[in-house]
């Protein structure tokens, strides 16, 4: 019997995915739980020049190595440890370093495109979409990128208008239809998070 419960958590940039993920992980104390962030799986671009890498659209599904993510998840589900890739954002390509990752009772796959790939979705026991108003998402992104990543407000707004918003509308928003539950208002929706956690606890206890 499959002993690993796989949870997918998707939603736009700044929607509150991480807050929801952390709340669920905290509520599942007593079980071994780990986060497998989709951001770990940006494609290796070492074959490209640095100038070519600078043009990478990280808000497009093609930026992710879903084949490797699916392969790692299959191994983890079968009780095998894996080496998870890491990404060097300063060089815009995969790092040589990896992270040792052991099988867990619950694995949470979190990322903007967590529900976009058919094969990946089929591996998930529970699929969650965190739905947050666009105005709030851009405000959160502005705060994060200017304070934590040293970017100017102008550059963040330009990226949002020219890349993030159109990619969200074209690729991310449509994945909402695949969710088992949609959590409005992101991490502030404690009731939805509690209901979701109860569902996950029930699934884990049956395995």
Curated annotation (Swiss-Prot):
CDD domains xref list: UMPK
Gene3D superfamilies: P-loop containing nucleotide triphosphate hydrolases (3.40.50.300)
Pfam hit, one: PRK
UniProt GO molecular function: ATP binding; cytidine kinase activity; uridine kinase activity
Residues where ATP binds: 11-18
GO cellular component: cytoplasm
Protein EC: 2.7.1.48
Family annotation (PANTHER family): URIDINE KINASE
Alphabetical list of HAMAP family matching this protein: Uridine_kinase (MF_00551)
UniProt name for this protein: Uridine kinase
Organism: Staphylococcus epidermidis (strain ATCC 35984 / DSM 28319 / BCRC 17069 / CCUG 31568 / BM 3577 / RP62A)
High-level lineage: Bacteria, Bacillati, Bacillota, Bacilli, Bacillales
Gene: udk
């Amino acid at each position: 019997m499959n002993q690993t419960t796989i949870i997918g958590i998707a939603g736009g940039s700044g929607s509150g995915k991480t807050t929801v993920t952390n709340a669920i992980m905290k509520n599942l104390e007593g079980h071994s739980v780990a986060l497998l962030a989709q951001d770990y799986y940006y494609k290796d671009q070492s074959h490209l020049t640095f100038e070519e890498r600078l043009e990478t659209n990280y808000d497009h599904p093609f930026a992710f190595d879903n084949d490797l993510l699916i392969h790692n998840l299959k191994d983890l589900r079968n009780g095998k440890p894996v080496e998870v890739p890491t990404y060097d954002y300063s060089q815009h390509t995969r790092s040589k370093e990896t992270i040792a990752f052991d099988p867990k009772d619950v694995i949470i796959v979190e990322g903007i495109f967590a529900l976009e790939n058919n094969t990946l979705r089929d591996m998930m026991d529970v699929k969650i979409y965190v739905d947050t108003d666009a105005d709030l998402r851009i405000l959160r992104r502005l705060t994060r990128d200017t304070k934590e990543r040293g970017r100017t407000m102008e550059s963040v707004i330009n990226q949002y208008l020219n890349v993030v918003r159109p990619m969200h509308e074209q690729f991310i928003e449509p994945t909402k239809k695949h969710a088992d539950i949609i959590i409005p208002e992101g991490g502030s929706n404690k009731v939805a998070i509690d209901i979701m956690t109860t569902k996950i606890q029930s699934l884990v206890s049956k395995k």
